[in-house]
Curated annotation (Swiss-Prot):
Its EC number is 2.3.2.27. It catalyses: S-ubiquitinyl-[E2 ubiquitin-conjugating enzyme]-L-cysteine + [acceptor protein]-L-lysine = [E2 ubiquitin-conjugating enzyme]-L-cysteine + N(6)-ubiquitinyl-[acceptor protein]-L-lysine. This is E3 ubiquitin-protein ligase brl1. GO terms for biological process: epigenetic regulation of gene expression; protein ubiquitination; transcription elongation-coupled chromatin remodeling. The gene is brl1. One of its GO terms (cellular component) is HULC complex. Pathway: Protein modification; protein ubiquitination.
């Protein structure tokens, strides 16, 4: 079941699952429902007033947590920086006391600067690392004086720390004040805007009525009521101005209270920090005045000097041993280099000899080939030369026979031609008869000799042809034998070359084996030398161990004294830590008390606001219960769209839902739209304004 604002005729309706009926304040159920709504509305208003206070308190707690985290991170950075500083001081240590300054690297200088920026938190922290700071002040790049006084520097850093805390608290105070002032200004502005909206709604409702309707509808007794309503509007203006003044006065009071409380908190925090610093200074003075502490410091300084002298002696011994080892290694290297140079020279000589051998063999092969081709002592070759000479003689004889035969044939032809000429010219050449007779006789003799000559020539020709054929066959055989001999000689020379190559390879392999044997021998020599060197190093190590034992016996006494001093120092540091813990616990208790006080003050302010609000609203609530209209006004819910406005001035009659004027402004732009709660359609002309 829920209560909804409706039009003036259907002023208050109750929507249930079964029916929709009007609110009747005479019944007990309706009255209880109305009172529940009023209580819910008041609680929502209280929550709205206290939300920003809670947000501010949460913001304050977050800032305090941030400050705690900042302090913890600073302490961690201090520890890291002091570890780095201890490393730097260990590397900065020099045995010469005459050195006053020492050039640092860029990284080391940046570390020292970071440490110098972070050294601003607690006196005990500085006291624990006082010797390292003294060394840095003596040997470092940020030298303060010839006789450094670190306490003054520590005091300066402590003052810087307190000023930093004050600055942080003042920043937090300003942030809180700004948030409070913005909250009260927003509340005042919202009240003024709501009152202006109410006035505008009243003016619009008055302008809607025309003068004629007022004359017809209102009786003679109603002008008095209208005058009374006008006086009520004036009274409302006076009440609003009073409320505004009350809000401003309350804001000023709250601001003054917050400022005073924050000032008290800052004063107490600074006082606690100063007390803490004073306690640590007193403890430092007391510890420094104790004679036992001074004696321990003197013993520590003497022990440090002894350790420095021992370290110097050891460093000189190490330098001598290293110098001796370096000289020995240099000599061994020089001997090995000389041996390697000799081996390289021998290798070059072997290469030159091999190249000369190859040249000599090539020249020998060429000379052998030439001699075999020019001067041969073989009988078969002589026979071939005789055959060739016989063939050449036979050819000459055959050619001579052919030439003789041709001459004979020429003579015969000439004789035949001469007979024919003589028969024709008998009469002309009678004088040459004697010559013809001679020729005829000769011709007859020749003709008688011709058949025998032909037979002899044929026989000689056949013999010559046979001899020629035999010579050709022998010549072919001789050529084949010559080719075979040449091939055999080539094979012989190839085999000789292969034999020479194999011999050279065999020699090279022997040389390689000899080199390997030499190399293995050198390696063995090197192994023997290394074993000797190792034995010498072992002897040196034994000597060094003996020296170390001698110095160790002397340093045992120093170490025992150091242990006693360290035990005493740990006891003193434990006492200091106990004091620091007690101071920290007292500081934590103070902080807890401050937080409790702050929570109580906040609760007091919230209760005072609630009490003032109850005082202001009690008479209004009582007046609201007097009339039904006032009860309806008090029982109105907040706008369901924005959940902020306390006044629903616009009503949709179709569904009976009401909303504030700000939420209904965008619906005036369209002629038709739907309800934002139940989505029932309506037009702009249907929207009604609700009046008190």
């Amino acid at each position: 079941m829920s209560v909804v604002n409706e039009s003036r005729k259907r002023r208050r309706l109750i929507h249930s699952e079964k029916e929709t009926r009007r609110l009747d304040l005479g019944e007990e159920d309706d009255l209880e429902l109305f009172q529940k709504e009023a209580a819910w509305r008041r609680s929502r208003e209280y929550e709205h007033l206290t939300v920003l206070e809670k947000k501010l308190y949460e913001y304050w707690e977050s800032l305090v947590l941030k400050l705690d985290h900042y302090v913890a991170a600073a302490l961690e950075n201090h520890e890291q920086s002091f570890e780095e500083l201890e490393k730097i001081t260990a590397s900065l240590y020099q045995p010469d006391d005459n050195l006053q300054t020492l050039d640092l690297s860029l990284a080391e200088f940046s570390l020292i600067k970071d440490a110098q920026n972070y050294l601003n938190k607690y006196a005990s922290y500085f006291q624990a690392h006082e010797p390292t700071l003294q060394k840095l002040a003596k040997f470092g790049s940020f030298k303060l004086k010839e006789t450094p006084n670190v306490h003054e520097w520590i005091d300066q850093r402590q003052v810087h720390f307190t000023s930093m805390i004050n600055y942080r608290t003042s920043q937090l105070k300003l942030a809180l004040l700004k948030r409070k002032l913005s909250f009260f200004r927003e509340a005042l502005n919202s009240a003024e805007l709501e009152w202006k909206r109410v006035q505008q709604d009243q003016l619009t409702s008055a302008s809607e009525r025309s003068i004629e309707n007022i004359a017809d509808d209102i009786p003679a007794s109603e002008p008095k009521a209208i005058l009374e309503n006008g006086e009520g509007c004036l009274n409302d203006n006076d009440n609003i101005s009073k409320l505004k003044n009350n809000f401003q006065s309350q804001a000023d009071l709250m601001q003054a209270n917050i400022n005073s409380k924050l000032d008290e908190l800052s004063q107490k925090s600074t006082r606690a920090a100063q007390l803490y610093v004073d306690i640590m200074g007193i403890t430092d003075e007391r510890v420094s005045r104790e004679p036992h502490y001074l004696e321990l410091k003197g013993v520590l300084s003497s022990n440090e000097e002894k350790i420095e002298s021992i370290n110097r002696d050891l460093s000189s011994l190490f330098e001598d041993i290293q110098f001796f080892i370096s000289q020995r290694t240099k000599r061994q290297k020089d001997i090995i280099d000389l041996k390697l140079a000799c081996v390289k020279e021998k290798q070059q000589l072997i290469k030159t000899l091999e190249s000369s051998l190859t040249q000599i063999r090539n020249e020998r092969d060429s000379l052998v080939a030439k001699q075999q081709m020019q001067y041969t002592n073989n009988l078969f070759f002589d026979d071939m030369m005789l055959l060739l000479s016989n063939l050449s003689n036979a050819r000459v004889a055959i050619l001579e026979g052919y030439s003789n035969r041709l001459c004979i044939w020429d003579r015969i032809e000439r004789s035949k031609t001469g007979e024919m000429n003589n028969v024709l010219d008998e009469k002309e050449e009678i004088s040459a008869s004697s010559a013809l007779e001679k020729l005829i006789k000769n011709n007859s003799c020749l003709e008688a000799e011709l058949p025998s000559m032909y037979a002899a020539f044929d026989q000689s020709q056949s013999r010559l042809l046979k001899k020629y054929e035999e010579l050709e066959t022998k010549e072919k055989k001789a050529l084949e034998m010559h080719y075979e001999k040449a091939r055999a000689t080539q094979k012989y020379f190839a085999a000789m070359k292969a034999r020479d190559i194999l011999m050279t390879e065999k020699k090279t392999l022997k040389l390689a084996e000899n080199k390997e044997h030499d190399y293995i021998g050198k390696l063995q020599e090197r192994e023997h030398a290394l074993t000797k060197y190792e034995s010498s190093l072992k002897a040196e190590l034994e000597v060094y161990k003996q020296i170390k034992e001698i110095y160790g016996k002397h340093s045992v006494e120093v170490l025992t004294e150091d242990k006693h001093l360290q035990v005493k120092q740990t006891k003193l540091t434990q006492k200091l830590e106990d004091l620091i813990e007690s101071v920290q616990k007292s500081g934590e208790k103070l902080m807890i008390m401050h937080q409790k006080l702050f929570h109580l003050q906040e609760e007091h302010t919230i209760l005072s606001i609630k009490a003032s609000y109850n005082k202001k609203e009690s008479h209004l609530i009582n007046q609201a219960y007097e009339t039904q209209e006032a009860q309806v006004y008090k029982g109105m819910l907040k706008c369901s769209v924005c959940n902020f406005s306390n006044w629903k001035s616009k009503l949709i009659p179709n569904c009976g839902h009401a909303f504030c004027s700000n939420c209904m402004e965008p619906f005036y732009e369209h002629k038709t739209s739907t309800c934002p709660q139940c989505e029932t359609p309506f037009s702009v002309s249907d929207i009604l304004t609700i009046h008190l």
